[in-house]
């Protein structure tokens, strides 16, 4: 149960997850003040929410703490760490995102050590090695870490968890970790969103009078995938903030329905007024790609326990590589026409997450995670995946990122 008059701080305020947390906290009458941190201000906030432009990566903890003091960031009870910086290799991801968390926690301890109760960290299903290939299903929180000696690469989620373990040890504050997957949501000025990319793809297909083919492969289309709606993640993180049993624990947080793209894709097609063609996987395309992942599939860590033979490295197979599709002149021209007609961002194609969606849709293995751990502690909410996409598309229209019709 939420306590009255608590003070929260949220990092990554302009991202999908951070923005959703801020909105959810603002709806909680028990929350007195919300401090939000990002490098730039991309939204207008009500009086209850205080924005602070702070660079967590390039400023020392003592300098961040000084800014906190000067700007009235004090008496923090609950800290939500949703900041993230993309890098082009795993070592750099660990260094950069680890340092941001470390700097933030040290600054908090310098200014709010007497009042801080819990840090709520957002990581993801990459914890299970999902980015490396096929994993053991369903993914449950007691699954082992993927050793670096096995994968050949570090994992920044492990780095961040270890930082919180180290800093909270022997202190009055603790931590808890939420692990979503493929977040669907909206934040003003943020395009790190598969829903936005899907919308761009559908709108250009409509403009060109071309079919709305699933760009991945038939196996994944007919298989299963877990998505996390940002509103549900935020609601879950508020729940875990005050749940004593969540102390020093991590939890999967996905929509909780049984989701297959073979159900969702036709509904998205109907929403945008495009058609899924018959026999959509029967034709060979010049834009098709097939990549074998360089790391062993993490399911092989359980080879002996499961009594299975060695699983080969997983493949990413796309009948249409969106990275190649978006480079076509006809696609660029079509979006330019749409943008001029509807008064939209003419450069939207440049910020679509095409590479990410190639990986997402091209997977040849299922993505299924268990919510049992949270369910056993009383969290029962879920969200229909298509409803989450629909609400996201509707919000993208309101923000004039995509056409109204």
From Swiss-Prot:
Entry GO MF terms: oxidoreductase activity
One Pfam family this sequence matches: PRISE
Gene3D superfamilies linked to this entry: NAD(P)-binding Rossmann-like Domain
Top-level taxon in the UniProt lineage: Eukaryota
UniProt xrefs under SUPFAM superfamilies: NAD(P)-binding Rossmann-fold domains
Listed name of the protein: Uncharacterized protein C757.02c
Organism encoding this protein: Schizosaccharomyces pombe (strain 972 / ATCC 24843)
Source lineage: Eukaryota, Fungi, Dikarya, Ascomycota, Taphrinomycotina
């Amino acid at each position: 149960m939420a306590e009255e008059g608590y003070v929260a701080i949220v990092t990554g305020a302009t991202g999908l997850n951070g923005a959703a947390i801020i909105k959810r906290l603002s709806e909680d009458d028990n929350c007195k003040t919300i401090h939000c941190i990002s490098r730039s201000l991309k939204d207008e906030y009500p009086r209850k929410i205080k924005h602070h432009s702070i660079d967590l990566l390039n400023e020392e903890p003592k300098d961040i703490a000084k800014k906190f003091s000067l700007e009235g960031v004090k008496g923090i009870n609950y800290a939500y760490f949703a900041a993230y910086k993309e890098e082009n290799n795993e070592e750099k991801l660990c260094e950069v995102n680890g340092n941001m968390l470390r700097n933030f926690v040290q600054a908090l301890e310098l200014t709010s050590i007497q009042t801080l109760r819990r840090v709520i960290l957002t990581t993801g299903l990459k914890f299970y090695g999902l980015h490396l290939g096929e994993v053991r299903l369903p993914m449950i929180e007691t699954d082992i870490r993927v050793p670096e000696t096995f994968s050949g690469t570090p994992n920044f989620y492990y780095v961040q968890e270890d930082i919180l373990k180290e800093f909270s040890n022997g202190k009055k504050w603790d931590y808890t970790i939420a692990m979503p997957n493929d977040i669907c949501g909206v934040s003003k000025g943020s395009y790190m969103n598969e829903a936005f990319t899907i919308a761009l793809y559908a709108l250009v297909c409509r403009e060109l009078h071309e079919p709305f083919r699933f760009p991945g492969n038939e196996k994944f289309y007919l298989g299963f995938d877990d998505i996390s709606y940002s509103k549900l993640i935020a609601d879950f993180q508020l729940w875990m903030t005050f749940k004593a049993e969540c102390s020093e624990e991590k939890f999967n947080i996905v929509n909780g329905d049984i989701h297959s793209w073979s159900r969702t894709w036709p509904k998205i097609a109907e929403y945008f007024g495009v058609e899924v063609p018959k026999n959509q996987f029967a034709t060979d395309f010049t834009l098709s790609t097939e990549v074998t992942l360089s790391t062993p599939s993490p399911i092989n860590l359980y080879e002996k326990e499961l009594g299975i033979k060695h699983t080969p490295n997983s493949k990413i197979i796309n009948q249409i590589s969106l990275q190649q599709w978006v480079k076509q002149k006809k696609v660029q021209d079509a979006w330019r026409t749409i943008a001029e007609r509807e008064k939209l961002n003419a450069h939207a194609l440049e910020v679509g997450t095409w590479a990410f969606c190639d990986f997402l849709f091209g997977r040849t293995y299922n993505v299924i995670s268990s919510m049992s751990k949270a369910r056993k502690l009383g969290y029962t909410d879920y969200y229909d995946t298509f409803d989450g996409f629909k609400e996201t598309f509707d919000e993208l229209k309101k923000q004039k990122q995509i056409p109204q019709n």
